[in-house]
Amino acid sequence: MLTFARQQQRRNVRWLLSLSLLVLLATLLSLCAGEQWIAPGDWLSARGELFVWQIRLPRTLAVLLVGAALALSGAVMQALFENPLAEPGLLGVSNGAGVGLIAAVLLGQGQLPGWALGLCAIAGALIITLILLRFARRHLSTSRLLLAGVALGIICSALMTWAIYFSTSFDLRQLMYWMMGGFGGVDWQQSWLMIALIPVLIWICCQSQPLNMLALGETSARQLGLPLWLWRNLLVIATGWMVGVSVAMAGAIGFIGLVIPHILRLCGLTDHRVLLPGCALAGAIALLLADVVARLALASAELPIGVVTATLGAPVFIWLLLKSAR
């Protein structure tokens, strides 16, 4: 038994080291790749000063943090709701952030600064989160809380559809691009959003013990002494914050929160002590590679990153499911 535990521990360490190395390589690729390839040796030149330090570095950092946040949100929600299909959009938090952002675009007539749009997106996500907490205070079961989140998401989606229908052509283009996701407008002015993500990401990665208990089910978690109501509220708030900030920076991006935790579980990483940091690293890698593809796929334009993640990720996910079923 001790030998098996040591082997498992070594395997987990190898996984985390491998993912960390891949994050470094993907970051290097993201900083070098673009309309002009800039090798690391040229980063201190005048051209590197503009393209790498002023344009690509803030974008790369934003992609890293958003990828980690979305993957961690998916892992937390799948443990919290005991549902492998749970992901950040399922509770309606992503759509709530979308409603806040769309309301700011329409009411501000495109004149609001980027920081104001970001605050509105975060406010929308937190409003949906507070509504969910109101349901949670009634001691609803996890399944009913999940259904409440789905219903809120449908309502927010309907509001966004109405807003797009009544918007002007300029607003419509801006809203449609946001709904497909993208990092094209990220620069150092959004650094406050990046900083807002970091403490919550670190805190979530340290919560392996309660999440391991929650993954066993509500009854088992109570028997083990976990204050279920408290932890459910804390995790829902943390998830709402991460999703709201991510939507404010990059718009709606699917696939990452659903598939990354699932893929790691299929690879044998079931303990949240390893799964949480693994999700943060793997989510960052996946979104970095998708962002590079979005930038380089077309010579004259940039693809929406949400389209890239769905197109590349869905076949890989199906293949892994079929492989695990054999």
UniProtKB/Swiss-Prot annotation:
Its main location: membrane. The keyword GTP-binding does not apply. The keyword Transmembrane applies. The chain crosses the membrane at residues 17-39, 59-81, 88-107, 111-133, 146-168, 188-205, 242-264, 274-296, 303-322. It is found in: Cell inner membrane. It is a multi-pass membrane protein. InterPro entries: ABC_BtuC-like (IPR037294), ABC_transptr_BtuC (IPR023691), ABC_transptr_permease_BtuC (IPR000522). CDD domains: TM_ABC_iron-siderophores_like. One of its GO terms (biological process) is cobalamin transport. Pfam families: FecCD. Keywords: Cell inner membrane, Cell membrane, Membrane, Transmembrane, Transmembrane helix, Transport. GO terms for cellular component: plasma membrane. One of its GO terms (molecular function) is vitamin transmembrane transporter activity. It comes from the Bacteria. The complex is composed of two ATP-binding proteins (BtuD), two transmembrane proteins (BtuC) and a solute-binding protein (BtuF). Belongs to the binding-protein-dependent transport system permease family. FecCD subfamily. Part of the ABC transporter complex BtuCDF involved in vitamin B12 import. Involved in the translocation of the substrate across the membrane. This is Vitamin B12 import system permease protein BtuC.
